[in-house]
């Protein structure tokens, strides 16, 4: 379910201030639920995934998505492959 238009997008206050002040530097954030806005285009943001920070470069196609969508919290291990046996 999407957020109400009346409320607007969510962007953490401290993250918004960092974007306005430090346009060119890397920004560290723990706010995975913040929405990507057009002011963030071209910025490297380090998003915390629970263990370490993942570096994400913001491009135009990401606008409207949440920051957490680009920093996975779980590591996917592939499913086991079935071994084909020769018939006798």
Swiss-Prot record:
Transmembrane segments: none annotated. One of its GO terms (biological process) is translation. GO terms for molecular function: rRNA binding; structural constituent of ribosome. PROSITE patterns: RIBOSOMAL_S19 (PS00323). Pfam families: Ribosomal_S19. Protein S19 forms a complex with S13 that binds strongly to the 16S ribosomal RNA. PANTHER family: RIBOSOMAL PROTEIN S19P FAMILY MEMBER (PTHR11880), SMALL RIBOSOMAL SUBUNIT PROTEIN US19M (PTHR11880:SF8). Belongs to the universal ribosomal protein uS19 family. This is Small ribosomal subunit protein uS19. It comes from Carsonella ruddii (strain PV).
